[in-house]
């Protein structure tokens, strides 16, 4: 006998059926909700659900651009507090690829310090963070509730010989960009005057990276070096953080349509960045112009080859102290084309994956497309590359 006014089994079944119908109809936004105490912005139920069920991967996302703060984290584990952790949890990003550019005659020693520091940081805070080493780690990181750290470098100057690839793989390195913006023994960077492609030494390094399961990244590489890498590598070559030169005429850090098509042919993934001068040559520059780059790649090779490589921390370059910002700009050639601002509004805060997902909804991407872009596509290709 069911009591009047009580919640009955029939009511529960009806509610469950209604929920199933709602989940089966993702095109229905079903309202908008404010989910961050620090912001009045509201997000659609569809986007909240998409972010909630996706594995979010930022294939160039630093934990901080304040390197003095980072040095304190390394020197004194207690200096990293729950307040420092909270923005990463709020972002819902599950994996941060924290690669930086190390080069020159001290590259090997600097790389040793880099990996020692980050391995120590992760070990000291293993209740919060985990190192991403394998496809299995990518599968379980979201369930674990921890923030995944993917160790990489944006230059391969630290490889003195092919055997060094094995050594640094043992220290946790899973991605290596062949060059930064300048020439090295492997190939040529994007801002060099001439690009003569991959050297014999570089080909040997790529071969060893394929063998041990370390991803080849060509985001900062010159045009010839980029294409050579696709020809030489037996595994997919990544472009973790770049944009489309067809939309930013002549910018050396953006990739040609030919390079983008190589990504598709290799069954790889291209990560779009929101760095302002890589998005548009003049103002205004908005999130809609960033979305144009997603559309361009989608139209050339399909949404299954798209991902995110923001190339910033959670707050962006424009939030850096002015002197640090000035020093950063001074380290690049004029061809970078810096303007007053470096970031794009809407992608310069911890909630940026939500804003990006809302933009992709506006551009009529399907739920499966968006899940792939937010991280599923990089998860797929990294798992393939890391298999040996």
Where are these regions (language model features)?
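N-terminal hydrophobic targeting/anchoring segments and the immediately downstream early-domain regions
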Residues: 6-193, 249-388
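Divalent metal-binding pocket/active-site signature
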Residues: 157-159, 167-253
């Amino acid at each position: 006998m069911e009591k009047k006014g009580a919640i009955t089994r029939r009511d529960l079944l009806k509610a469950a059926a209604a929920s199933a119908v709602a989940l089966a109809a993702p095109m229905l936004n079903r309202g908008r909700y404010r989910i961050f105490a620090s912001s009045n912005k509201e997000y659609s139920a569809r986007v909240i659900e998409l972010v909630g069920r996706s594995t979010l991967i930022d294939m160039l996302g630093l934990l901080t651009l304040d390197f003095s703060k980072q040095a304190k984290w390394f020197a004194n584990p207690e200096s990293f507090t729950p307040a420092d952790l909270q923005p990463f949890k709020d972002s819902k990003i599950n994996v941060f690829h924290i690669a930086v550019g190390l080069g020159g005659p001290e590259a090997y020693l600097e790389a040793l310090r880099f990996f020692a520091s980050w391995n120590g940081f992760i070990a000291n805070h293993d209740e919060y963070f985990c190192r991403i080493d394998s496809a299995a780690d990518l599968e379980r990181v979201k369930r674990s509730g921890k923030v995944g750290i993917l160790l990489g470098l944006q230059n391969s100057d630290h490889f003195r010989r092919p055997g060094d690839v094995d050594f640094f793989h043992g220290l946790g390195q899973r991605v290596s960009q062949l060059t930064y913006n300048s020439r090295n023994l492997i190939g040529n960077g994007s801002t060099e005057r001439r690009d003569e492609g991959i050297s014999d030494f570089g080909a040997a390094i790529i071969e060893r990276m394929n063998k041990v399961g370390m991803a080849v990244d060509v985001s900062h590489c010159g045009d010839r070096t980029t294409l050579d890498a696709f020809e030489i590598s037996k595994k997919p070559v990544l472009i973790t953080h770049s944009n489309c030169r067809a939309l930013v005429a002549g910018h050396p850090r953006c990739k040609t349509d030919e390079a983008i098509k190589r990504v598709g042919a290799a069954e790889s993934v291209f990560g779009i960045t929101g760095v302002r001068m890589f998005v548009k040559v003049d103002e205004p520059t908005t999130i809609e112009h960033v979305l144009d780059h997603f559309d361009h790649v989608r139209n050339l090779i399909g949404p299954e080859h798209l991902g995110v490589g923001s190339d910033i921390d959670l707050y962006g370059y424009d939030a850096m102290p002015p002197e640090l910002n000035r020093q950063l700009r001074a380290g690049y050639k004029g061809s970078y084309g810096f303007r007053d601002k470096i970031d794009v509004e809407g992608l310069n805060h911890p909630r940026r994956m939500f804003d990006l997902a809302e933009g992709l909804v506006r551009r009529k991407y399907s739920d499966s497309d968006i899940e792939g872009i937010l991280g599923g596509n990089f998860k797929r290709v990294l798992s393939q590359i890391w298999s040996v």
